[in-house]
Amino acid sequence: MGNEEISDFEKQRLANIAERDALLKQLSLNAQSVFTPTLPNRATGSQAKTKKKPAPKKVKKEEESPAPRRMSSRLRGIAADSEVAKRKAEEQHQAYQEAERAKRVRKSDSFSLNDIFVSGQKLSGDGLLGVDVVTKGVAVPYQRTFGDDDIKKTTDKELKALRKEMSELQLWEAWEPNRIKLTPERVYTMTFHPSETKPLIFAGDKMGHLGILDASQEKPTSVKQEDEDEEDDDPDPVLTTLKPHTRTISSMVIHPSKPTHLYTASYDSSIREMDLDKTTSVERYAPDSTSDDVPLSGLDMAADDPNTLYWTTLEGEFGRYDMRTPKQGSVAVWSLSEKKIGGFSLFPTHSHYFATASLDRTMRLWDIRKLSRREPVPVGEHQSRLSVSHAAFNSAGQVATSSYDDSLKLYDFGAKGIASWKPGHTLSDAEMKPDTVVRHNCQTGRWVTILRPQWQINPQSHIQRFCIGNMNRFVDVYSSSGDQLAQLGGDGITAVPAVAVFHRSKNWIAGGTASGKICLWM
């Protein structure tokens, strides 16, 4: 009988006993750790003599309500599987959900920038002023796809001169990119201040932080004392980090006629205005209730109107609001897509036209003058094989889009006479086909911000140009005809500068990475 195999029931019973004993042992150890004080270890003589490094400067964080602490039911005297235990678990889960929900509720109040200050230097008012590509791309870090040989082979003199000029842009020498951490989290959007006297960069991240960097600063030179650590002799750049939003800052704009005002749009459903002179931040637009969740995906302003905001949402909506009027009854909203609109832009010289890029794989051209609230009809649309991430208009009437089919598409509506179109003008499918298609790896994955083209608004020559991040850790510059002008890189770039922006008139280009760090070419 002793050699008989144990039945399945007996095996399960023994396994349950072993599991119970292990659990009781673990609970006993946990209880001992709660009530047993931990004595500090005494350092040996050699360790005690070691020079202590100065403690890092602590950044004052916003006070948060303490999260509910966990304690075992046994220590609380609650029997297992009892109604009290179930009620306790439900209360803990509800408290956690409420805490997470509170973090995401937007801040509707007006406040000074010191109220939303996170780290860095505090600001003062005078301190600032074809055919779709079928194959998927594979990123190869630091492998160039454009360089000096391409410039030498260029036969067009003007194009060759511009390629040489753009390729000679150099990384900011004061600090390497891996030292310039402008935001705590992944950069989602960036912009330059319009000023041509100094490069002033703004960056918004995934958690609602706003970073500000004055790149005209010079690296301080200091005489090292004998008792100073080596780290103290190499300070980081001076920058400022604020937190005006509770969720992702998706877009930002500074109107050239109001250079002291920065407008930011966020997934927390609000648009805020930051006054750089008065160092204040006020809410300019948001839904009536804080419980309304309408994440904003894009923001733009007409070149001839510094008072009207235009935006798009992840719900496929397009909105307009004149800040000089009461919000009640004056906000206009159109539903343009059943799926999210990832990006949009106004035609700078004729702002009643705008282009949208959507998850439904379309780039659509619209005319606000003929936009019906009930059934809005576009001027025309073009469908790609996969979703379209962004549609950017330039002053010549050309639109650049990026798409997950690994292509950049260029549409020349200026050549089709967009400036003279009458209200109600429409384009056929053939007229909406892109004039140029450029192969470009747009497979960003989960941890890299989506690649979006961005035009230089006022280029220094008649050749229009735009920049876009490159998955091989570069920033690419293209002309409106699809010719590559430069591939910018450099030492110290350890991640993809996915968010790339041009200064509106100077040949300054900035790139932001998933770690919140900045690259700057000038």
UniProtKB/Swiss-Prot annotation:
Example of a GO cellular component annotation carried by this entry: nucleus
SUPFAM superfamilies per record: WD40 repeat-like
Region span, Disordered: 34-89, 217-239
WD repeat ranges, renumbered to this chain: 182-223, 244-284, 294-331, 336-376, 381-422, 445-488, 491-522
GO biological process: DNA damage response; regulation of DNA damage checkpoint
Matching InterPro entries: WD40/YVTN_repeat-like_dom_sf, WD40_repeat_dom_sf, WD40_rpt, WD_repeat_DNA-damage-binding
Protein name according to UniProt: DNA damage-binding protein cmr1
